[in-house]
């Protein structure tokens, strides 16, 4: 597979979701990444990823069955990149 040209956080799918969703991201180079979930008030409710990832495309599965229905924000951050995607949990 070709190496991505830039950092990217894709739209989570499915969205809206019930209990489980998939978060995909790509990196053009090896980097330390964090992906965290925040509620509508900005409070961190889950840390999904914290580690070193090689360049390429990656997937993270999130099971939110213990959280309430509502709007959440997926935030991906590295030394070179920050992006946030909105997601709706519907039970």
Which residues fall in each region the model found?
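C-terminal outer-membrane/trafficking sorting elements
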Residues: 2-13, 17-91
